[in-house]
């Protein structure tokens, strides 16, 4: 099957676009009870635009949204208690809107998934794994570099939607300095401040990618620590010493940075083919949001 013949699945890392809408849209946008609704409005605009953009020549669009059910609970916390401990809790005004965003997905006819144990990344990883085996080409919609590790098929893409930056496997390697299948290794070495994942002191993304160009995985590095000092970059002996001193953290950090592809989660069993909105649900959610006629008409005629 050629890339033109393959159906393409668009898997959305929803939280990023909800947070972006929260910061981008005026907070005087409110629902029927006077509560902030700016994130829902922004997210709905994003979904509308995406559906319009991703329709194939046949009119078909395969879309799914993955949500983080909790900002604090994750199986990764069982591995490392301080995982994401640096993040402040979401404001109550935003937490309320996450529920609205999921309701909006259902009203818009978009499959939505979540888990109390696994993160949206793992849901996307599992969906990508399943759908790729079913013959789909995969596009991951996210600004999170972690998810670039899922660009494994020759027709797969990682799409930073807001910046309109779409990368295939070669593009990922050019931008991040490692192959998609090495992204987790790079982050395990360098750490990830956003998620509060520790790394080897003194090793950033550039140096991590250089080491991984010689030793392909964290496991290979651990078997060849004594060879690092022979590499041709300034301070190689010092880097070897640091890796040797902190090697005990690497198996843990590799687990933290690796996306799960066999996660269990809740969501619709139906095909992710977008088959149009549910008009009754659309009217219901827009009533809750106290939306005007213009927004309703736009969705009713999509």
Stretches with model-predicted labels:
Residues 3-138, 147-157, 161-166, 250-252, ...:
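Noncatalytic, basic helical substrate-engagement surface that gates or grips nucleic-acid strands
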Residues 6, 55-64, 166-302:
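Non-catalytic nucleic-acid-binding/docking modules located in mid-to-C-terminal regions
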């Amino acid at each position: 099957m050629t890339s033109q013949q393959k159906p393409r699945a668009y898997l959305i890392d929803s939280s990023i676009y909800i947070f972006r809408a929260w910061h981008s849209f005026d907070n005087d946008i409110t629902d029927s009870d006077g509560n902030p609704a700016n994130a829902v409005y922004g997210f709905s605009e994003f979904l509308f635009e995406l559906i319009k953009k991703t329709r194939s020549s046949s009119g078909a669009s395969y879309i799914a949204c993955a949500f983080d059910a909790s900002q604090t609970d994750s199986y990764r916390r069982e591995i490392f208690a301080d995982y994401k401990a640096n993040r402040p809790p979401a404001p109550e005004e935003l937490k309320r809107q996450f529920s609205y965003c999921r309701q909006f997905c259902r009203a818009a006819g978009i499959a939505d998934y979540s888990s109390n144990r696994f993160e949206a990344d793992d849901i996307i990883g599992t969906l990508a794994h399943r759908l790729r085996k079913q013959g789909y080409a995969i596009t991951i919609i996210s600004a999170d570099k972690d998810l670039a590790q899922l660009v494994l098929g020759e027709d797969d893409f990682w799409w930073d939607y807001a910046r309109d930056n779409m990368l295939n496997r070669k593009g990922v390697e050019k931008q991040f300095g490692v192959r998609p299948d090495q992204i987790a290794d790079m982050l395990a070495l360098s750490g990830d401040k956003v998620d509060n994942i520790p790394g080897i002191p003194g090793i950033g993304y550039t140096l991590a990618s250089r080491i991984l160009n010689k030793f392909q995985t964290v496991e290979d590095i651990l078997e060849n620590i004594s060879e690092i000092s022979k590499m041709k970059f300034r301070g190689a002996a010092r880097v070897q010493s640091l890796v040797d001193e902190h090697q005990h953290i690497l198996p843990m950090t590799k687990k933290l940075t690796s996306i799960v592809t066999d996660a269990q989660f809740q969501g619709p069993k139906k095909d992710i083919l977008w088959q149009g909105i549910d008009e009754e649900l659309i009217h219901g959610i827009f009533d809750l949001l106290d939306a005007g006629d213009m927004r309703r008409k736009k969705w009713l005629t999509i």
